[in-house]
Amino acid sequence: MTSKKKLINFSDRIFIAGAAGLVGSSLKKLFIEKGYGKIDKRGIILSPSRKELDLTNSLEVENWFKKNNPDVVVIAAAKVGGIIANSHNPVNFLLENLKIQNNIIESSWNNGVRRLLFLGSSCIYPKESIQPIKEEYLLNNSLEKTNEAYAIAKITGLKLCEYLRRQYKFDAFSLMPSNLYGPGDNYNLQNSHVLPALIYKFHKASITNQRELTCWGTGKPLREFLFVNDLANACIFALENWDFEKDIFPTDNNKNKLSWINIGSKEEITIFDLAKKIAKLTNYTGIINWDQSKPDGTFRKKLDISNATYLGWESKTTLDQGLKITYQNFLKNYSTKKLKK
């Protein structure tokens, strides 16, 4: 179910916060491919670097908005990381993410932005949740402790958008994607997510002929992985088509219409089977050990994406296809020493 008229225009000034990151870079490329940001159509894609705009500085962000006057804003900027990084640096994860999103959302509201999209994460949902996870399950139970700080920040951003929409009719909404991966990911073993960490670990073991390697946990947890280009497609699709006033969505316990939807691939895999896939992809033939003294994180996180399906969106990239593309990009950057680490 989509609107007949697109809700964003080729002539819009579109600000992508975090345009150099995994999601932002894919999103910027797709916006341009679809015809946005072209001078002959009076549009522009605004994608300042960290040096050009410190998103944690509220005064700097407010001044940038007054000078550049964006019509559409996508918040793809965030401090992200895996279990190790989240567990060791909860203060940094909470403070930095709160600053980034609060500064952008408030300046968007102050300066007449017409449409704002905030990107969250599936980690906002309770650790012990009914599966698949519906949007209305938010705050029904306690969070996973290993990434609680990041989750709290994302919940705050989601709720700020919801309250601004409800109280001031500000057109802000959110998408909650499942576990992301793709070209341009972070491969630092100390702060990366599980999939890129496994790619790096297995590739290194393969080229150095290691006889065995060790992965964290039991390998039993299930994960739903979403290729980053599919999320970029979902972002633009939602910006163009999600008419909040016309489309019907579930309500919370107070009968308020929800202002976020889940985005996922509907494809689940255990970490054990993911490791086997990546071992095959990287030509690793040694033994895979599992260190069960390390945390698994949430056992299962499968999102219910029926609302996205209702809007007319679905993912296009299978896990096997996405892994192949991601590894090819990894090899290209590994050989030229351009990996994000």
Identify what each model region corresponds to.
Residues 94, 98, 146-158, 188-196, ...:
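Short-chain dehydrogenase/reductase
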Residues 145-178, 197-208:
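Active-site Tyr-X1-5-Lys
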Residues 19:
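NAD(P)H cofactor-binding loop motif with strongest signal on the N-terminal glycine-rich segment
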Residues 58-98, 110:
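NAD(P)H-binding glycine-rich loop region in Rossmannoid oxidoreductase-like domains
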Residues 34-63:
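Adenosine-cofactor binding site in Rossmann-like domains, unifying the SAM/SAH pocket
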Residues 6, 11, 22, 26-30, ...:
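C-terminal substrate-binding subdomain of Rossmann-fold SDR/epimerase-dehydratase oxidoreductases
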Residues 102-147, 173:
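Conserved Rossmann-fold NAD(P)-dependent oxidoreductase catalytic core, especially the SDR/UDP-sugar
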Residues 124-126, 149, 173-197, 221-222:
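Flexible, glycine-rich beta-alpha linker
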